[in-house]
Structure formats: C-alpha cells, structure tokens
Regions:
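Helix-loop junctions on the cytosolic side of multi-pass membrane transporters
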Residues: 184-203, 226, 249-258, 487-497
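Transmembrane-helix bundle of Major Facilitator Superfamily
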Residues: 2-188, 351
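Alpha-helical transmembrane segments and their membrane-interface exit regions
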Residues: 181-184, 240-246
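A membrane-interface helix-boundary motif in multi-pass transporters
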Residues: 164-174, 222-232, 301, 421-475
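12-transmembrane solute porter fold
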Residues: 14-29, 34-38, 49, 55, ...
Length: 507
C-alpha cells in the first residue's frame, strides 16, 4: 500500500470526486424515480402493461449490457472522454423524455439513457481509480457509495414531490440539470487517462458479449407475459447461450481480451462479482415492488410513498462512510456477510407486516434491510478496482458494474414473474389467469379487478399472501449469499491477520 497516497495525485482530485459522485447520484434517480412516477406517466402517455414495464426494463437492459463495453472503451480511448460523452448523452436523453408524447418513444429514449449512464459510470469510476491511492481510494469510493445511497434514499421522495407539484416531466428536467452540472465540472477538472498497454479494442468480444447479455435479459423480461416454455422465450435464451459460448472462445484466443478470463481463478475476484449481484434480490427489487404495492394496492399517494421508501434507503446516507472509515480493521468478507445476514433478517421480519397494522411494523423491518445492505454497499466499488492492476481499472469497473446492473435487471424480471406466479396460486380457478395475476403483481388493481372478475378485498388478500411468500424466498436467498460470499472473500486460514487482504488494499 502506498504510504503517501497523495503523492503524484492531482490536486483537484476532490473536485473530480465531486463530478463522479454527482454523476453517481443521477444513476439511482434515473432508476427509482420513474417507478414512483409510473402511474402519472401511464395516465399521460397511455400504454399497456408490457409497454409500461419497459419504462424500467429498457433502462436496466441497456445499462447492464453496455457497462463492460463502456469500461473497455474507457481504457482504450480515454476515461474522461467516455465520462463526458456519457453525461452529455444523459442530459440529452432526459430532455427528450421530458418532451415525449407517447409511451413507445419514451421507452426508446429510456434505452438511450441506459447506454449513456453506462458510459458515465464506467468512465467516472475508472478515473477515480487513477487519481486516488490507498486509504484515499477507499474513502473516495465510500463517498461514491454514499452518493448512490443518497440517490436511492431521496429518489422516490424527489420523484413523488416533483410529480405531485409539477408533473412527471419535471423529474427528467431535474435529471438533465444535474447531468449538465456534472458535465461542466468533469470537463474542467478531470485529467485524461487511458490504459497504456491497450491496443485495438476487442470488438468481436464486445459485440458478442453485448448480444449474449441482451438476449438473456430480453428473454427473462418476456417470460412473465409469454411463459418460460414459449418459443418467444426459448429462442432468445438459446441465442444467449450460443453467443456466450462464442464469447468465451473469442476471449481465450484474443491477446488483449475485453474480459481476462484468468481472473476467475482467484476466489476474491469471484467473490466481488457475487457480492455485486447480492443487493439485486435483497434490496433493489424492493425499490420497485414496494412503491407499486404502496400506491397500487394500499392506496398511498406518491409523496407518502416517497417518505416511506426513505426509511429503506436512509441508512445509505451514513453507513457506507462509516464502513469505509473502519475498513482497515475488518476483512471485506466479514463485513459484507454481516450486512447480508442483517438484510435477510429484515426481509423475514417484513414478511410479517399486513396492511392495517401500525406503520412501525412496516418501517422498522425496512430500516433493518437498509442498514444491512449499507455495510457491503460502501465497500463494493472500491473492491472492484482493488482486485486487478490499476491500468485495467476500466475493465474491472465494467465487469463489476455489468454483474451488478445486469443482475438487478434479471432479478427484477424474475422476482416480478415469481410474484405473479404466487398471486395466481393464491387465486382459486376459474378466477386466476396469467394476465390478471401479472396486473395485480404490477399493482394495477383496476385492471386486475376487470381481468380476474373478483372483488378488491379478495385480490388484496391474495396479493398479501403472495408478497409474504416472496419475501421469505428473498430472505433465504440472501442468507445463502452471505455464507457463500464470506467463504470467497474471507482470508484463508493460512494467512495471518496482518497479511490478510483488507478492504483498503489496492495494487
């Protein structure tokens, strides 16, 4: 570890951190905001269940599929260049969405927004790895994690307030303004950097991987409506498998691959990727499902929903920073596993809540989940760039962010499909049908009532039972993840405490 982390570091590095953190704030706002404003968007732009689901899915699909390519582009052509281009496209896409007149064009622009966000995130985080070293790097990435937490915490509240006061279009005008500020600051303060060993870009690998992940995500997103055994789902799944096999062959034969497959021989690298996926099913899915439940099933307003969601994400405001401050005393595996165990306990606790009970029965479990996930949250971004040489920071960021975001998109689709399946099982035939169960899972009570020909009380009861079962399954999955991640990230027995890798270690 560098004993003098500030030596040879650019003096404006904290201004660079401000630019990247502001860009990092835009990502969760772009993800959580439209979920709260979805009802208002639907009233204004129209669209069926499938088109409305793509308000979230289009962003997640393109964001996740573009991150690894964006990281490779950052290493090859310049991290600042990719960061600035991403922010410019983010500002433009937000302005276009604020002026959208129909749901199809809105969804298409959301896809562009996802690609733009991938470029900004990959370029920004790779730049941070170049200007910060040692303990300062750990602190910088903890601040970035806290910024993500602020966006997650206040995104629903901001979206609900803006939507109620000025309409949903104001949310995207706000995102455009934030993007412009980050763009100006980054252009002024960030130095250019690139991988000196990078030659030509691994275009075959980049294209094949993007196609594989796109087809996989697309298939999972179609499954709730078409069914897992339908040709519409089987065909893209088969294509994804074939493209992924081709990607592995390409990367093995490429001198400078986009993804160095040899890294997967190292347990800590694998552990970091598993950790990247863990929040998807323990926390992120709740950011979409809970607003749909509160607004569509329980009848809360957008501002009330934003206030309640603040309880889930408020711990992100402080705990990631505290985790970074004490990072040198504990192993990453121990801290991350402890957080996931707490999160699993909160999910099981939340499963006992039923509408009509005191708000404390709802908010305390949500607070517990938020506290638990905050512990690994402040470590993940720093860990991602600490397991590879600094010159491959863009690749590391791309891999980690791809696993994280693609995992979130796939988890959202699978969990949504699972909730619809559970709802259907709690509705006795002939009432139950797939379209009605999906509408109820999406929180669309009027449409579900019409499709299922049942009274609202019965539908709410079926939804509550299904949601309870879902939370138990998520708790069990999170518990298993805590154990597995501990085994991969915890120092082996042969290492002494002084030689064991710590959270702040960096090459």
């Amino acid at each position: 570890m560098n004993a003098h982390p500030s030596r040879n570091a650019p003096p404006q590095r904290w201004l660079i951190l401000f630019s990247v953190c502001l860009a990092g704030l835009i990502m969760p706002l772009s993800f959580t905001g439209p979920a709260v404003a979805l009802t208002a968007i639907a009233k204004d732009l129209g669209g069926g269940l499938v088109a409305l689901s793509w308000v979230t899915n289009a962003f997640m699909l393109t964001f996740g599929c573009s991150l690894m390519l964006a990281g490779a582009l950052a290493d090859r052509f310049g991290r600042k260049r990719v960061f600035i281009c991403g922010l410019a496209a983010l500002a433009l896409s937000a302005l276009l969405m604020s002026a959208a007149q129909d749901i199809m064009s809105f969804d298409a622009i959301r896809a562009l927004q996802g690609i733009s966000a991938a470029a900004a995130l990959a370029g920004g985080t790779a730049s941070l790895a170049q200007v910060f070293n040692g303990p300062e790097r750990s602190k910088a990435f903890s601040l970035l994690g806290t910024t993500f937490g602020i966006g997650l915490a206040f995104g629903p509240l901001l979206a609900g307030t803006l939507t109620q006061l000025f309409g949903w279009r104001a949310l995207f005008l706000c995102l455009a303004l934030l993007s412009a500020i980050a763009l100006f600051s980054g252009q002024r303060d960030m130095p250019e950097s690139r991988d000196p060993a990078a030659s030509r870009l691994d275009w075959p690998g980049a294209i094949v991987f993007t196609l594989a992940l796109s087809l996989l995500t697309y298939a999972v997103l179609l499954a709730p409506d078409s069914g897992w055994s339908s040709a519409q789902v089987i065909r893209p799944l088969t294509g994804a498998l074939l493209f992924m096999l081709a990607f592995i062959l390409i990367e093995r034969r490429t001198a400078r691959p986009m993804l160095d497959l040899s890294l997967f021989r190292y347990p800590r690298f694998v552990g970091v990727q598993l950790l990247a996926a863990a929040p998807a099913y323990s926390y992120v899915v709740l950011l979409v499902l809970l607003p749909l439940r509160f607004i569509g099933i329980e009848g809360y307003g957008t501002v009330e929903t934003g206030m309640m969601m603040l309880t889930l994400s408020a711990p992100m405001l402080a705990l990631p920073l505290l985790t970074g401050a004490f990072a040198h005393r504990f192993s990453a595996g121990a801290v991350s596993s402890l957080g996931l165990l707490i999160c699993a306990a909160g999910l099981a606790w939340l499963a006992h809540y039923a509408p009509g009970q005191s708000l404390a029965r709802l908010l305390l479990p949500m607070l517990t989940i938020g506290c638990g996930i905050s512990l690994p949250w402040g470590l993940m971004d720093g860990l991602a760039v600490s397991v590879v040489p600094r010159e491959r920071a863009g690749m590391a960021t791309g891999i980690f962010s791809t696993v994280r975001v693609a995992g979130e998109g796939i988890a959202l689709a699978i969990v949504g499909a699972l909730l619809a399946l559970l709802v259907g099982r709690h509705l006795a035939p002939p009432t139950a049908n797939a379209a009605g169960a999906h509408a109820l899972a999406m929180g669309d009570m009027p449409r579900a009532t019409a499709l299922l020909n049942a009274d609202a009380a019965r539908l709410k009861h079926a939804y509550e039972l299904a949601f309870q079962n879902l939370l138990y399954l998520l708790a069990l999955t999170t518990l298993a993840s805590a154990v597995i991640i501990f085994l991969f990230l915890h120092p082996p027995a042969r290492e002494t405490p002084s030689s064991a890798p710590r959270i702040t270690d960096a090459p």
